């Protein structure tokens, strides 16, 4: 009977040990395992979210870079257009200024020509009167002289 009683005592001790483990040891171990699983799952979710966020951020950065390049290209194109426009305006202004200077020079030449013609008329009239005086051997008074010069100038 010793064997039976020992076996029953061991079975009872084992049952108490199992009950004790199930009641006091097993729940904290299971809770720790569940918490660890939850932390691992949360970590994996966070890593997945971080990967998605990183991909999204990279896409946004690429899009912004593309937009910035397009804007820079537009600004450069506008600058080239404006520079060409300024060059054309400068050419037009220079051409107009040159034409204006040519017209001014032509006007001055015309005035000088008229002045020279008038002076030449006066000199020709004076020479004609001097020649006539010498031919006639007579002197004409100043008033008569002016009248003849004006008359000759009008005829010429």
UniProtKB/Swiss-Prot annotation:
**Pfam family membership, one:** ATP-synt_B
Q: Which GO terms describe its cellular component?
A: plasma membrane; proton-transporting ATP synthase complex
User: Is Transmembrane helix one of the keywords?
Assistant: yes
Where the protein is mainly located, per its record? Answer: membrane
What NCBIfam families would the database entry show?
Answer: ATP_synt_b (TIGR01144), PRK05759.1-2 (NF004411), PRK05759.1-4 (NF004413)
As for family, the record states: Belongs to the ATPase B chain family.
Spell out the protein name for this chain: ATP synthase subunit b
Task: Specify the taxonomic lineage.
Answer: Bacteria, Pseudomonadati, Pseudomonadota, Gammaproteobacteria, Oceanospirillales
